[in-house]
């Protein structure tokens, strides 16, 4: 087993069975290739990323710790699991943080003593058909930090993170946000409550002895950034020096020539 090895190119051998694999640590010849690379291969940064600016911009794939960022505030774009956990960590480290929230599902990390992965399994949600063609991939906001916990955007805001809508434009030192923050939060809440309802029904139907958890349905009051969302932000005036693009990945099989 070799670790830290990047596969650069793989192609079928000429005239005989097998493959020639070029890697960052030399060439390997093998009879079989298993491409278990998953969907998270190539970091994606949208075309709206401002070019040649004074901002420090990185994809979430290249973020490791708060200390790698320059002094100043941070705009985190994307509120899936990566974006939420990065924003949370930065705020805890003393950074002023803005979090751009798009459409998402927000499952409970745990409910009635069971992890959300267990619930997805017993409720058949791993095999569920998509509700809308073209929406096969849904951003999921869930955290594994500090032992794992349910993502609560209102709680993040009450702690000091400013929530904004989907980022539409980033240019000339200004960020423009969509008028969709309230709807995105509402739909995330809806997906959360739907899973709780389905879990409760499953417990009743199967006669399981799992403790009730009524507090899971309690939401904090809406923070000001949600009731009166920003639609435009002057980055310099806000003291923002960094942008983290937590905007997902694309598949990339250009290395595989078979």
What are these regions (language model features)?
Residues 1-258:
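Flavin (primarily FAD) cofactor-binding/catalytic cores of flavoenzymes
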